[in-house]
């Protein structure tokens, strides 16, 4: 059986994100596929090189909470039979209050099966 290498538990969640690949100022909007304390996975129509730095904003509509963060592209892969790419990014230097929010959000999602 394959062991999961992830440090953090992911929860499936469709959240709106806006991102820009630095140093570009072109903002694109997409939806997440899942989120963890360590990062997010989302789909996009553009190739994002591995190790690229991005600036993102994530919106949690049910709680009216949002935050911006710097992230690093850890991996990217083509989605078969599609013109999309699946991207995994890691949060860089999140403030403690954002980490606390994510931990509570994920814990609530896992305990209730309900996503905020």
Show where each model-derived region lies.
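N-terminal helix initiation/capping motif
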Residues: 1-37, 104-116
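Short, surface-exposed secondary-structure edge patches
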Residues: 8, 43-47
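Hydrophobic core residues within well-ordered beta-strands of beta-rich domains
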Residues: 13, 28, 54, 67-69, ...
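Short conserved beta-strand and strand-loop elements enriched in small hydrophobics
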Residues: 16-20, 52-66
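Conserved positions in beta-strands of structured domains
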Residues: 20, 33, 72-74, 92
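Short beta-strand-centered aromatic/proline hotspots
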Residues: 30, 68-77
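Short, solvent-exposed secondary-structure boundary/capping segments
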Residues: 41-44, 79-90
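Short solvent-exposed strand/turn elements
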Residues: 84-102
